[in-house]
């Protein structure tokens, strides 16, 4: 059985880049590295994931009229247990610029 080589690109989206509401330190520096991996053409498939939320997502602080990173109590419907939820800044809202794959990343039509 032959092996398939896959490159998985996880959540390289505008809202996670420098200046975004959920900026990840060093994420911008990954763009040229990923572009080089894509350019090498040594992968049988490229998978790119995107984090997408509705504008009123339960994890957004704005949904609860709270400050980002404040905490609220929520009920887990499956277990019936109360849990603490840390509220996040509004990010990666479906079909917005922030949820799009970062501009500098090479895009291929055949991403999975």
Task: Kindly give the residue locations of the regions a language model identified.
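Active-site alpha/beta core segments
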Residues: 32-112
């Amino acid at each position: 059985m032959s092996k398939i080589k896959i490159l998985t690109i996880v959540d390289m989206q505008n809202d996670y880049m420098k200046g975004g509401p959920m900026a990840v330190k060093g994420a911008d520096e990954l763009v040229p590295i990923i572009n080089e991996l894509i350019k090498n053409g040594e992968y049988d498939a490229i998978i790119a994931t995107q984090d997408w939320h509705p504008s009123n997502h339960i994890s957004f602080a704005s949904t609860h009229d709270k400050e980002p990173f404040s905490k609220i109590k929520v009920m887990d419907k499956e277990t019936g247990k109360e849990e603490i939820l840390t509220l996040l800044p509004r990010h990666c809202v479906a079909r917005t610029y922030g949820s799009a794959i970062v501009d500098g990343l090479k895009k291929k039509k055949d991403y999975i």
